[in-house]
């Protein structure tokens, strides 16, 4: 079981932003920007393009809803969608609020927000997601 599966199962605490029976979204604990969110399928699959077509399509639709909620909760010019997938063997999508392309440079120093900031941000995103 991957760390992301354990997070989605509630075995490891997370800052939950959205969920349904197939997908789970939570804040990255080492974000590039406040609101940096990870979206995962509950189905444990290492490589995103190994997901079956139905799951991949549904993941994108769920991710879109999370991105809309994120943009409402954390005003930004756009929400970037990035798929890297080398650090954790579980398919996942990064959603990053951005003002410019520099905001999605993974080589830059990541933020270390206080737990209260993380929880407030997750709560705002969750509330916006519930409106969709």
List where the protein language model places each region.
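HIT superfamily nucleotide-processing domains
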Residues: 1-132
């Amino acid at each position: 079981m991957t760390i992301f599966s354990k997070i989605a199962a509630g075995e490891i605490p997370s800052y939950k932003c959205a969920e349904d029976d197939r997908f789970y979204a939570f804040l990255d604990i080492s974000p590039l920007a406040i609101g940096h969110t990870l979206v995962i399928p509950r189905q444990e699959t290492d490589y995103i393009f190994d997901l079956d077509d139905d799951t991949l399509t549904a993941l994108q639709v769920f991710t879109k809803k999370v991105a809309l909620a994120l943009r409402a909760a954390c005003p930004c010019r756009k929400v970037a969608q990035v798929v890297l997938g080398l650090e954790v063997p579980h398919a996942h999508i990064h959603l990053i609020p951005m003002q410019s392309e520099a905001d999605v440079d993974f080589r830059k120093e990541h933020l270390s927000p206080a737990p209260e900031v993380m929880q407030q941000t997750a709560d705002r995103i969750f509330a916006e997601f519930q409106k969709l």
